[in-house]
From Swiss-Prot:
Name the UniProt record assigns to this protein: FXYD domain-containing ion transport regulator 4
Species name: Homo sapiens (Human)
Keyword Coiled coil among UniProt keywords: no
Gene expressing this chain: FXYD4
Function comment: Associates with and regulates the activity of the sodium/potassium-transporting ATPase (NKA) which catalyzes the hydrolysis of ATP coupled with the exchange of Na(+) and K(+) ions across the plasma membrane. Increases the apparent affinity of the transporter for Na(+) and increases NKA activity.
Assigned protein family: Belongs to the FXYD family.
Topology, Extracellular side: 21-38
Length: 89
């Protein structure tokens, strides 16, 4: 078990070291500018959050309720657990 754990940790560590290559080729099609990607993601998320809060606070998005109020529990509820239905295993 210890050998498997050590092998998995070594495998994860080697891939992490390879991913943080400081001499990466910027012309490579798989090279990403992570700082700009993170910044644009945060800006997009912030704008969506502000738009969502504005939509909720504007009052234009209201639930249409019918005239008849529905109760969450039916009038004649069927009990799911009846006496004698429980077993001891």
């Amino acid at each position: 078990m210890e050998r498997v754990t050590l092998a998995l940790l070594l495998l994860a560590g080697l891939t992490a070291l390879e991913a943080n290559d400081p001499f990466a080729n910027k012309d490579d099609p798989f090279y990403y500018d992570w700082k700009n990607l993170q910044l644009s993601g945060l800006i997009c998320g912030g704008l969506l959050a502000i738009a969502g809060i504005a939509a909720v606070l504007s009052g234009k998005c209201k639930c249409k309720s019918s005239q008849k109020q529905h109760s969450p529990v039916p009038e004649k509820a069927i009990p799911l657990i009846t006496p004698g239905s429980a077993t001891t295993c």
